Amino acid sequence: TYVPNYFDILPMYMVILVMMPLMVALSRVSVWAVFAVMAAIWLFAQRSALDSLGMIDLHLGFPAEPWSDRKWFFNPFGWQLVFFTGFALMRGWIPKPPVNKALIALALVIVLANVPLSHIGMREFGFDWARDWRIANSGLLNKSDFGILRYVHFLSLAYLCWAAAGD
């Protein structure tokens, strides 16, 4: 599974595409089965959560190359959550989100609240408290394993784009 440093986004897509027949087959049983498997795979890709539960041996991830313990920069088992969320929306397994002011406001608050927590917020605006918060809560923002706050941020940003584009 050799992958040069940080070049594993294309192999990540290949792993996710290999998972596609499983998800489509599960959808014939129940879309809830798809969502349960998506969530379980994502959960077992969360290194920090498993570590805190003493279950790190169950972590789903590939080594970047056979001779080291370096992990993939984009763990496909974490990132499949965003891929299959989009797939579920396109297949109609998840209904189109309604466009309303309350959801737009909530999504905007989430996106703006992430600015201080971003590297730009820390570097350009001097939000030093955010650095401490990020260190203490690194699993929530983990890019490699696709932490839950990244997912919430993605959903919020995607919703704002959906609302702006219209039906």
Task: Outline where the language-model segments fall.
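Alpha-helical transmembrane segments and their immediate juxtamembrane cytosolic regions
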Residues: 1-167
